[in-house]
Amino acid sequence: MAQSVPPGDIQTQPGTKIVFNAPYDDKHTDHIKVINSSARRIGYGIKTTNMKRLGVDPPCGVFDPKEAVLLAVSCDAFAFGQEDTNNDRITVEWTNTPDGAAKQFRREWFQGDGMVRRKNLPIEYNP
């Protein structure tokens, strides 16, 4: 059963943070690449700490071993310096898919007793 094996590693490019540069009076979009470095098919979901300002597309999916997916990370216009951005980040959560499951994302994979791993990518805003 897939849930008894801990999910393997993923890699992200960039690896430690996402940087947006001023001005912030228009929407910005950057891209991150997520690579399934493991030997199993995994399901992933993306969370953000500020859903009004930050968006990710596609927000969830499934990918096979060694497969990579390109995600668009968007930052909507906001008043830089007047809003708290210290805790802004996106979190990649991933788990093994059940053996024999179709390559279609299912939210319940994250709600059972299987292990879910997380990687936080802080957002840095340059003035």
Swiss-Prot record:
Gene: msp-38
Function: Central component in molecular interactions underlying sperm crawling. Forms an extensive filament system that extends from sperm villipoda, along the leading edge of the pseudopod.
Top-level taxonomic group: Eukaryota
Protein name (Swiss-Prot/TrEMBL): Major sperm protein 38
GO cellular component: cytoplasm; cytoskeleton; pseudopodium
Modified residues (N-acetylalanine): A2
PANTHER family xrefs: MAJOR SPERM PROTEIN, MSP DOMAIN-CONTAINING PROTEIN-RELATED
Single biological process term from Gene Ontology: oocyte maturation
Predominant localisation class: other
Domain MSP: 9-126
Tissue expr: Sperm.
Swiss-Prot/TrEMBL keywords: Acetylation, Cell projection, Cytoplasm, Cytoskeleton
Gene3D superfamilies in the record: Immunoglobulins
Leftover remarks: Around 30 MSP isoforms may exist in C.elegans.
Organism: Caenorhabditis elegans
Intracellular or extracellular location(s): Cell projection, Pseudopodium; Cytoplasm, Cytoskeleton
